[in-house]
Amino acid sequence: MKGNVLIMAGGTGGHVFPALACAREFQARGYAVHWLGTPRGIENDLVPKAGLPLHLIQVSGLRGKGLKSLVKAPLELLKSLFQALRVIRQLRPVCVLGLGGYVTGPGGLAARLNGVPLVIHEQNAVAGTANRSLAPIARRVCEAFPDTFPASDKRLTTGNPVRGELFLDAHARAPLTGRRVNLLVLGGSLGAEPLNKLLPEALAQVPLEIRPAIRHQAGRQHAEITAERYRTVAVEADVAPFISDMAAAYAWADLVICRAGALTVSELTAAGLPAFLVPLPHAIDDHQTRNAEFLVRSGAGRLLPQKSTGAAELAAQLSEVLMHPETLRSMADQARSLAKPEATRTVVDACLEVARG
């Protein structure tokens, strides 16, 4: 092995999945990858399954916490810093890559204190607290969306690392002429109950002759009741609690209705898919709206705020694009033009460049 690399990412799939893509690229180049995470994040399941050694530190977020938690915070942060220092001194990595989550704060500071080159990557159009704090001390600041960070010599717009099998060329789907449009509804692995309620009612108002074929990921707890909602309004739909093969789902779809998480937006561009985006209204710093605007500005998506979009409005917008397939084709072309197929390699290149000094 050429040396150790330490990846820091935790909490949600939006941080962990891009980090796993980078881990595979590091391994392909002959580096041993170790992972720094927290005991409560999704990394505890995904990282061991990927065959990577996982090192845990005790740290949690501060936003929205009560006074008691805020009083304890300095001690907790100091403890997590010493834990991260211990891991880095043990591994002696050639570089540390942080992709977000609470773990990256103490981990990034520990890298700096140990003189290990630090690279950070921000998946969203609005930088998270940890990445904003680490940007001044990082050797490279990678961003998925342009201008997330202030302009500097160390800023690099890379896109989001996305699994290679999600990239589809313009000829991967059957032409829209003479067939129904395929509509994919995604609410994340847990499902988005507002979408589960809105879509059946809206699709019932779409004229039958243009109504799309529907595949709806409703979440494990909501699949049964969502299927019943479709049956109640006499709309045929394939409702699933979870979709494990997203590459196949994207290849099937012609249009997606979904939230606007960073990874979802990047996957839409990789697959060349137009989207109606309903950002999570309570996301930190409203970052999902900013993510969605990236697609909307280019004509690849439409923004539908949850609070102001009812069934009639959604039905009208759906009917418009369903009656004009050329609109969907144009949106798909715009989405594909935004894809960054080299994102993973670019991030890893940046890490190894600073590692070499």
UniProtKB/Swiss-Prot annotation:
Q: Which InterPro entries match?
A: GlcNAc_MurG, Glyco_trans_28_C, GlycoTrans_28_N
Q: In which pathway does it act?
A: Cell wall biogenesis; peptidoglycan biosynthesis
Membrane topology classification? Peripheral membrane protein
Binding-site residues for UDP-N-acetyl-alpha-D-glucosamine, renumbered to this chain: T12, G13, G14, N124, R163, S189, I243, A262, L263, T264, V265, S266, E267, Q288
Read off the Pfam families from this record: Glyco_tran_28_C, Glyco_transf_28
Q: List the EC numbers from the record.
A: 2.4.1.227
What this protein is called in its record is UDP-N-acetylglucosamine--N-acetylmuramyl-(pentapeptide) pyrophosphoryl-undecaprenol N-acetylglucosamine transferase
Query: What species does this protein belong to?
Result: Pseudomonas aeruginosa (strain ATCC 15692 / DSM 22644 / CIP 104116 / JCM 14847 / LMG 12228 / 1C / PRS 101 / PAO1)
